[in-house]
């Protein structure tokens, strides 16, 4: 709905960036205030180590949302609190807000519904399928940078209007859920039947630092393209600060056909096909209007840059009253239908009934007006005024792009089909980042199984008991499979998980299905050998006529058995925790195209960097650790353990700093920190290295993902813990804990 990567593993800082600029404080120089222009920023302003070493690893992304930042405490159970809500009563309270216009920000057409639809859309619309980041799941629209994106102009007012509802229901209704629920209520009160709503989005209490929004340092800049307008991965918008595309056309060029290319690419990157794209654009633009009553120069600072007395509101306009009919948001001034607060099919009628000519809004933005048309479109604040139908450049893309036109005409002729398509696409848009349906809460969750939710079959039968688990471990270890093979297969299965959108993981055993079984990082031939052997173990166990074991459980159990054996060989007895209950998904429950987005282009835990990776390996390792929701200590111990267990992709010896591969020792850390060796680069890209001892003999080889644990001061401090003479037991214990965490990341059925 328009008005208008990899995570941050390092912190680019420019001299004039907002985080390094020092605000002028009246009287500061005269009073000797330390906050003086031209000085390095105080730590409270974002100064510190990053000021001096902007390319240093940002380990803070491995410590997201710490417990000390949560005012609710660790015992707060949001799911239980949400279940206690009277949801119909909440919706009635929201509906009352929607039709109670406030003088401080008057409602267009007497109804805030369209504004709230845009708010919900923009909350969810930051999601991108490539890394699963963005989306509505944590209510990040409240925080920088999203609260101040140009495309989110004046949505601060929408959230402020909802404060009475939030205040009434307190922590039983998160902001994240409230934003999406309000979008649904807005649609319903304007005559549309939604597909459903699920709660369960828990609020966080700090801005995300792990999302790469683009390389630009200026709003609406577009340095993200190369070649023939090829958009950088994993980005999902065409310009910095936009949700999707520029409504005026590419870089403001009012070309509907060229705009269609941008639309298709950006919507594809958030998992929408052409039909869903048309439904969302047309459905959203059935309601409300854009705002461009005057020049953009009249608009003040965004919420994050506004003075304290604005109390979190931004974009104060000096143009006339600055609100209502004088409001400025995108600079465009378009109302699409004659019934902007009621669901209908008029958008398509207006799209096809007229020829349009290019014009400009009062703010000077490119838009289109119907030729030879009557003035049928109402004014939002003056009932005596009417205007001709108008469209955005991106609206006309639905008419002039051949594929979009075909869909649009079908929807025009079949209103019920259009309504169903919009309902489903809206539900997908607003729930795409929530993960499996086990996480959905509330009485309005649809019963229909949807492929994009990565469905799993229902679990049947009794879970395995301790004796059966022990017997299966013995059977696994009696095969010809090595520790490295078993560990690698389990990691390939479980480490596909992404904490960003809760997709992937071991449950479902999709590692045996397309597309995962063919991923380069998973060593397809080696993986196939392991799966055949484990399927044999499964068949033997199942044939006894008692309980059945899923391959999903068996893959994880086998990896755990291998870890136990490797620890035993190192002289440490340990039991790897295992909770049965995983199920096996079928190929027809797996959207191959959608799952392809989960393929790792890099995995530092397996010392794997694919050809498409664009950052040095140590940054990519942190990005993968962030997606796996790992801390810095967990990342450190897992890398050290997986190296000595031989879990590298392709059997690479890089980083296998041990004479006892397959044994769970702390040798990786001991040998990395050995004062008797010297590391030197062996590649022009400086991504491969060799270590020589005093005699000049090559002792080890490694990559940037290995050497960083001796180079980065914070990671070295962690490596020193595990390299200590007293660390043998602690290393194994911590490795097992971190391993088990990864194996269970997708076990939402256990919550």
Curated annotation (Swiss-Prot):
Keywords: Heme, Hydrogen peroxide, Iron, Metal-binding, Oxidoreductase, Peroxidase. It is an enzyme of class 1 (oxidoreductase). One of its GO terms (biological process) is hydrogen peroxide catabolic process. Its EC number is 1.11.1.21. The record marks 118 as: Transition state stabilizer. Heme b binds at residue 285. There is a cross-link at residues 244-270 (Tryptophyl-tyrosyl-methioninium (Tyr-Met) (with W-121)). Pfam families: peroxidase. Formation of the three residue Trp-Tyr-Met cross-link is important for the catalase, but not the peroxidase activity of the enzyme. One of its GO terms (molecular function) is catalase activity. InterPro entries: Catalase_peroxidase (IPR000763), Haem_peroxidase (IPR002016), Haem_peroxidase_sf (IPR010255), Peroxidases_AS (IPR019794), Peroxidases_heam-ligand_BS (IPR019793). Gene3D superfamilies: 1.10.520.10, Peroxidase, domain 2 (1.10.420.10). Its cofactor is heme b. There is a cross-link at residues 121-244 (Tryptophyl-tyrosyl-methioninium (Trp-Tyr) (with M-270)). Binds 1 heme b (iron(II)-protoporphyrin IX) group per dimer. Disulfide bonds: none annotated. The active site is at residue 122. It catalyses: H2O2 + AH2 = A + 2 H2O; 2 H2O2 = O2 + 2 H2O. GO terms for cellular component: cytosol. Residues 1-22, 291-320 are annotated as: Disordered. Homodimer or homotetramer. Bifunctional enzyme with both catalase and broad-spectrum peroxidase activity. Belongs to the peroxidase family. Peroxidase/catalase subfamily. NCBIfam families: cat_per_HPI, PRK15061.1. This is Catalase-peroxidase. It comes from Streptomyces griseus subsp. griseus (strain JCM 4626 / CBS 651.72 / NBRC 13350 / KCC S-0626 / ISP 5235). The lineage of its organism: Bacteria, Bacillati, Actinomycetota, Actinomycetes, Kitasatosporales.
């Amino acid at each position: 709905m328009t008005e208008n990567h990899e995570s941050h593993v390092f912190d680019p800082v420019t001299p004039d960036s907002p985080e390094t600029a020092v605000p002028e404080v009246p009287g500061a120089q005269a009073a000797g205030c330390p906050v003086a222009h031209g000085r390095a920023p105080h730590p409270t302003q974002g100064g510190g180590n990053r000021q001096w070493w902007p390319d240093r690893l940002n380990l803070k992304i491995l410590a997201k949302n710490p417990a000390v930042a949560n005012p609710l405490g660790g015992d707060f159970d949001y799911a239980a609190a949400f279940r206690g809500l009277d949801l119909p009563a909440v919706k009635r309270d929201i509906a009352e807000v929607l039709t109670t216009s406030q003088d401080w920000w008057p409602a267009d057409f007497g109804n805030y519904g369209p504004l709230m639809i845009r708010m919900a859309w923009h909350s969810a619309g930051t999601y991108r399928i490539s890394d699963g980041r963005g989306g509505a799941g944590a209510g990040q629209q409240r925080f920088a940078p999203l609260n101040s994106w140009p495309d989110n102009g004046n949505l601060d007012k929408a959230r402020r209007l909802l404060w009475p509802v939030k205040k009434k229901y307190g922590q039983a209704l998160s902001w994240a859920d409230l934003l999406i629920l309000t979008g649904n209520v807005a649609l319903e009160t304007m005559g549309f039947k939604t597909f459903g709503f699920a709660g369960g989005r828990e609020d966080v209490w700090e801005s995300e630092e792990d999302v790469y929004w683009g390389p630009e340092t200026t709003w609406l800049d577009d340095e993200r393209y190369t070649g023939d307008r090829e958009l950088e991965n994993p980005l999902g918008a065409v310009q910095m600060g936009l949700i999707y595309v520029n409504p005026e056309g590419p870089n403001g060029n009012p070309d509907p056909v060229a705009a269609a290319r941008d639309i298709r690419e950006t919507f594809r990157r958030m998992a929408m096909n052409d039909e869903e794209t048309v439904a969302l654009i047309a459905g959203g633009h059935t309601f409300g209007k854009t705002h461009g009553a005057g020049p953009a120069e009249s608009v003040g600072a965004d919420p994050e840059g506004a003075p304290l007395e604005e109390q979190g509101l931004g974009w104060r306009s000096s143009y006339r009253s600055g609100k209502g009919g004088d409001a400025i948001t995108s600079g465009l001034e378009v109302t699409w239908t004659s019934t902007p607060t009621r669901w209908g099919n008029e958008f398509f009628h207006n799209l096809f009934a007229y020829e349009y000519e290019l014009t400009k809004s009062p703010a000077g933005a490119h838009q289109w007006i119907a030729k030879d048309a009557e003035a049928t479109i109402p004014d939002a604040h003056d009932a005596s005024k009417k205007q001709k139908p108008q469209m955005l450049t991106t609206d006309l893309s639905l008419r002039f792009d051949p594929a979009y036109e075909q869909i649009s005409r079908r929807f025009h002729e079949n209103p019920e089909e259009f309504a169903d398509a919009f309902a489903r696409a809206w539900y997908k848009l607003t729930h795409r980042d929530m993960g499996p349906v086990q996480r959905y809460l509330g009485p309005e969750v649809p019963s229909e199984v949807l492929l994009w939710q990565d469905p799993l079959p229902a679990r049947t039968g009794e879970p395995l008991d301790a004796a059966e688990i022990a017997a299966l471990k013995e059977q696994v270890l009696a095969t010809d499979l090595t520790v490295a093979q078993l560990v690698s297969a389990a990691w390939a299965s479980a480490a596909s998980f992404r904490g960003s959108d809760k997709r992937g993981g071991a449950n479902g055993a999709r590692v045996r299905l397309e597309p995962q079984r063919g991923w380069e990082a998973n060593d397809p031939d080696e993986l196939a050998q392991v799966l055949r052997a484990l399927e044999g173990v499964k068949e033997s166990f199942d044939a006894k006529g008692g309980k059945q074991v899923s391959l999903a459980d068996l893959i994880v159990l086998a990896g755990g058995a291998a870890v136990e054996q490797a620890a035993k060989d190192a002289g440490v007895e340990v039991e790897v925790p295992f909770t049965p209950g995983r199920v096996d998904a079928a190929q027809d429950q797996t959207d191959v195209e959608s799952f392809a987005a989960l393929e790792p282009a890099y995995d530092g835990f397996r010392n794997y960097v694919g050809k498409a990776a664009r950052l040095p390996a140590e940054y990519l390792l942190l990005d993968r650790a962030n997606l796996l929701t790992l801390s810095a200590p967990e990342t450190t111990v897992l890398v050290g353990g997986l190296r000595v267990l031989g879990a590298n992709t392709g059997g690479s010896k890089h980083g296998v700093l041990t004479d006892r591969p397959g044994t769970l020792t702390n040798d990786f850390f001991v040998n990395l920190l050995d004062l008797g060796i010297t590391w030197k680069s062996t590649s022009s890209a400086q991504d491969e290295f060799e270590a020589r001892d005093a005699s000049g003999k090559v002792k080890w080889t490694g990559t940037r993902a290995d050497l960083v644990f001796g180079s980065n001061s914070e990671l070295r401090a962690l490596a020193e813990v595990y390299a200590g003479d007293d660390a043998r037991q602690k290393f194994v214990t911590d490795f097992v804990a971190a391993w088990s965490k990864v194996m269970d990341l997708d076990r939402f059925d256990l919550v």
